Amino acid sequence: MALSLFTVGQLIFLFWTMRITEASPDPAAKAAPAAAAAPAAAAPDTASDAAAAAALTAANAKAAAELTAANAAAAAAATARG
């Protein structure tokens, strides 16, 4: 019951905040369409950014796989010892 009341309180606060935001929009939000219309030359190189992100993701996945394998080996050794 307490969790439900807390959730209802959060929703009320969320909608209250949204109502205030809609009543007085952020000036930076008005400037966003102008920034989106910037020339393509000012845009970052998304291909190299994507390649860097893919390399980072692959490195993180490899590290996670190695850690998982090490943990599994340690758990198997501990189980074998009894």
Swiss-Prot record:
InterPro entries: Antifreeze_1. One of its GO terms (cellular component) is extracellular space. Keywords: Amidation, Antifreeze protein, Repeat, Secreted, Signal. Residues 1-23 form the signal peptide. Induction: By winter conditions, at least in part by water temperatures of below 8 degrees Celsius. One of its GO terms (molecular function) is identical protein binding. Changing residue 77 to E: No significant effect on 3D structure. Detected in liver and in blood serum (at protein level). It is found in: Secreted. Changing residue 46 to V: No significant effect on 3D structure. The modification Arginine amide is found at residue 81. Changing residue 55 to E: No significant effect on 3D structure. Its main location: secreted. Changing residue 51 to K: No significant effect on 3D structure. Residues 24-44 form a propeptide. Belongs to the type-I AFP family. Contributes to protect fish blood from freezing at subzero sea water temperatures. Lowers the blood freezing point. Binds to nascent ice crystals and prevents further growth. This is Ice-structuring protein A. It comes from Pseudopleuronectes americanus (Winter flounder). The lineage of its organism: Eukaryota, Metazoa, Chordata, Craniata, Vertebrata.
